[in-house]
């Protein structure tokens, strides 16, 4: 829908999407990773608070949404899809922090960001984007004044913590 298109077209490095249920955040997350993976070869993640949650929300839908001719192969154990252009999209869980280390990412969607530990972003995921100058999108529903709210403020012009690399 039109709000998702605005998000897809945005060129900010970091985007915080705070939206209510049924906005289409999960669909946006999958499509955003796919569009970027088709445009620029690399590794893209969708990270949920838990591996199980990522599998339930994204894995089966992602397999259906990517046209067969774009898929090189799928790895059901690792929840990864290798595209014919060499890109890879993986579903991850922040509950297994060790599985998030030691790689370089082109882009990541942090899903249900308010339910994740800020340390996972700051100490584990963010460093994976440094070499490629990769992007990150944080999505979730509003859940009070927490680290996700703080990220949201970074993208709001006029806030004390505004950062021009961010959009909310």
Residue spans for each PLM region:
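Phosphate/NTP-binding elements of NTP-utilizing enzymes
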Residues: 1-168
């Amino acid at each position: 829908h039109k709000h998702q298109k605005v998000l897809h077209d945005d060129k900010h490095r970091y985007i915080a999407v705070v939206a209510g249920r049924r906005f289409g955040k999960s669909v946006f997350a999958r499509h955003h990773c796919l569009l970027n993976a088709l445009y620029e070869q690399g590794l893209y993640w969708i990270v949920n608070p838990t591996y199980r949650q990522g599998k339930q929300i994204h894995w089966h839908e992602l397999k259906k949404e990517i046209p067969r001719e774009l898929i090189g192969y799928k790895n059901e154990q690792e929840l990864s899809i290798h595209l014919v252009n060499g890109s890879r999209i993986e579903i991850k869980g922040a509950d297994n922090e060790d599985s998030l280390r030691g790689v370089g990412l082109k882009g990541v969607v942090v899903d249900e960001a308010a339910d994740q530990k800020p340390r996972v972003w700051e100490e584990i995921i963010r460093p994976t984007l440094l070499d490629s100058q990769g992007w990150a999108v944080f999505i979730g529903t509003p859940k009070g004044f927490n680290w996700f709210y703080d990220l949201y403020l970074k993208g709001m012009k006029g806030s004390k913590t505004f950062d021009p690399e961010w959009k909310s």
